[in-house]
Amino acid sequence: MAFILGSGSPRRLELLAQLGVTPDDIRPPDIDETPQKGELPRDYCARVTRQKAEAVTSNPEDLVLCADTTVVLGRRIMGKPRDAGEAAEFLLALSGRRHRVITSVALRKQDRLWQKDVVSQVKMKRLSDEELNAYLATGDWEGKAGGYAIQGPAGALIPWISGSFTAIVGLPLAETATLLQTAGYPLYKDTAS
């Protein structure tokens, strides 16, 4: 049985390492992540994660783990910004407000799929022009849902969260561990030999 991480995210790889898990292979799927018309944010996140898990090629005995993280303000899905201008637009919309971060994680083995969605609340402080421009200049917004990463410089902009910190980063560890154990992955195998 091979364990395949269906994600190119270095953050997910680092989070898996906290569980003592090293993927045998990394195969980021290439799927269309465009929200469907009228699709609710949690449904969108779950669908994209499921499609990612189904898109990764694997052998029948392999385990494939995929996840998707979505930043949501009201019903607005904030994906990865195309450029600094869109990142600024996202951050200004989030400034001084609470929003949701939804992370869906899926584990597939053959035709079996285990999936869990985790919804966390995040409050971003009211950003001054100086803070916004300084953060944009770091480039840390690139490739990040909502235009920020809580585990980087943007952590200074987040005074409050409710939920799972690791889910906000990109992979809810408690839920991921449960999925791995449910699928028979030897998560806490004896390493003292």
Curated annotation (Swiss-Prot):
SUPFAM superfamilies: ITPase-like. Its cofactor is a divalent metal cation. Pfam families: Maf (PF02545). InterPro entries: ITPase-like_fam (IPR029001), Maf-like (IPR003697). The keyword Cytoplasm applies. Its EC number is 3.6.1.9. GO terms for biological process: nucleotide metabolic process. Its main location: cytoplasm. The record marks 11, 69, 151 as: Important for substrate specificity. GO terms for cellular component: cytoplasm. HAMAP family: Maf. This is dTTP/UTP pyrophosphatase.
